[in-house]
C-alpha cells in the first residue's frame, strides 16, 4: 500500500478474514496476481503481447527472445562510460528509467531483505509500440513479495545500498552501470529523497501501518488461537511495534546512505 501510485507496477491488496466450508482460517491478505493475464486486462491488450521476466533474466511469461533483448540492454549499459548522451537516450527508449530508479529507491528504503536476488519481475508490451505508457514497449518493474522488509529481518540502519552493490544479479548490475552517469545518480538520489519526504516518509508509513494494524486487531485473538503464528496477541503486538520502530527511524539512515553514495562501487 505504501507504493500505490508510484511509477512502477504494484498489486492491489485486501485484508480479509477467510473461511473454508465455514471453518475459520484467520486473517489473510488477498493480493492481486500480477501476470500476463492481469496486465493484459489492465491495459486492454492481448495476453500474448506481454512478456514478463524474473530474477536472473528468466522467462516467466511471454517471448523468450525478450531475454536476449533485456540482456543486450544490460550488457551495453555495463559497457557505457556514463557520459555519452546518445546511450542515455537509447536507455530511456528501452527502459522506463524514472520508474526503475524509483523502484530501486523504494526497495532499498523499505529494507526488503528478500531482494534483489529473488522476487524481481519486469515486463514489457511486445505489440506495436504506442505513444502512451505503459504500452510503449519499454521495460517496467513490478514491486513483488516484500514480506521480509520493514524491519522483519534487519533493523532501520540496514544498508540495502551495499546489498544491491554486492548482489551480482541483473537488476543490480543494470542499476550500478546506470550509476556511472552523474545525471542518473542525481535522479536516483532525488527520487529517494522525494520518497522519504512524501510517500515513504515516517508520517505516512506510520499512518498506513497503524491503519492496517487497527483493521487487523479485532481478529488477532482468534487468528493466533487458530495458527499460533504469531504465538499470541502479545507477540503480534511486539512485531507491530518493531515495524513502528522501523517506520520512525528508517528515514534518517536511508537519507544518510543516499547522501553518502554508499551504494557506489
Task: Please tell me what each predicted stretch does.
Residues 35:
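ATP/NTP phosphate-donor binding region
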Residues 1-8:
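Zn2+-dependent metallopeptidase catalytic core
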Residues 11-12:
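Short, small/polar residue-rich loop motifs at catalytic or cofactor-binding pockets
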Residues 5, 16-19, 23-24, 28, ...:
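Middle-to-C-terminal accessory/interaction subdomains
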Residues 41-48:
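Catalytic cores of eukaryotic secretory-pathway lumenal/extracellular enzymes that build
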Residues 51-53:
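Extracellular cysteine-rich, disulfide-bonded domains and loops characteristic of secreted proteins
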Amino acid at each position: 500500500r505504501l507504493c500505490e501510485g508510484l511509477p512502477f507496477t504494484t498489486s492491489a491488496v485486501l485484508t480479509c478474514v477467510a473461511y473454508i466450508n465455514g471453518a475459520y482460517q484467520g486473517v489473510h491478505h488477498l493480493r492481486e496476481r500480477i501476470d500476463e493475464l492481469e496486465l493484459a486486462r489492465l491495459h486492454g491488450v492481448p495476453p500474448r503481447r506481454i512478456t514478463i521476466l524474473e530474477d536472473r533474466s528468466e522467462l516467466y511469461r511471454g517471448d523468450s527472445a525478450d531475454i536476449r533483448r533485456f540482456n543486450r540492454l544490460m550488457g551495453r549499459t555495463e559497457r557505457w562510460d556514463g557520459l555519452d548522451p546518445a546511450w542515455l537516450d537509447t536507455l530511456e527508449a528501452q527502459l522506463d528509467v524514472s520508474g526503475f530508479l524509483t523502484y530501486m529507491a523504494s526497495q532499498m528504503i523499505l529494507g526488503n531483505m528478500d531482494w534483489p536476488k529473488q522476487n524481481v519481475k519486469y515486463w514489457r508490451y511486445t505489440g506495436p509500440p504506442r505513444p502512451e505508457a505503459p504500452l510503449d514497449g519499454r521495460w517496467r518493474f513490478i514491486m513483488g513479495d516484500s514480506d521480509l522488509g520493514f524491519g522483519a529481518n534487519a533493523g532501520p540502519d540496514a544498508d540495502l545500498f551495499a546489498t544491491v552493490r554486492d548482489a551480482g544479479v541483473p537488476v543490480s548490475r543494470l542499476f550500478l552501470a546506470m550509476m556511472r552517469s552523474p545525471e542518473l545518480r542525481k535522479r536516483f538520489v532525488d527520487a529517494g529523497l522525494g520518497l522519504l519526504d512524501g510517500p515513504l516518509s515516517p508520517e505516512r508509513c506510520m499512518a498506513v501501518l497503524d491503519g492496517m494494524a487497527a483493521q487487523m486487531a479485532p481478529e488477532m485473538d482468534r487468528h493466533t488461537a487458530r495458527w499460533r503464528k504469531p504465538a499470541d496477541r502479545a507477540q503480534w503486538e511486539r512485531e507491530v511495534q518493531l515495524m513502528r520502530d522501523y517506520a520512525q527511524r528508517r528515514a534518517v539512515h536511508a537519507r544518510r546512505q543516499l547522501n553518502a553514495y554508499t551504494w557506489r562501487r
